[in-house]
Amino acid sequence: MPRDRIVAESGMILRTEKSVLFVIPWGNHWIVGTTDTDWNLDLAHPAATKADIDYILEHVNTVLATPLKHDDIEGVYAGLRPLLAGESEETSKLSREHAVARVAPGLVAIAGGKYTTYRVMAADAVRR
């Protein structure tokens, strides 16, 4: 989202009925998100759906003086989380913890985790 579309000096954190949305300043833009949507299509090409974008706009617009529109969006990106298997079918209910295993002599594998804890994950992998 272009920086001039949101009048603010700092980022925001918004709580929704399903998640938390972030509005983060980044250079000349704002990064607005995130969603946690099941993805059952091509795993090599995840994409933000119209429903994801509508959800974000609907919720962020509740706190903005000037609502954002689809035409304001300059780019979107999506990714998949490497979640560990668990008890639930819903990804939003699965643990964000990571696991480290020595697969073979000299080979360590790591699964799960979050981008925000990559340093802890790396340290755990090195200690193996």
Set out the residue ranges of the language-model regions.
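C-terminal catalytic lobe of FAD-dependent flavoproteins
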Residues: 1-128
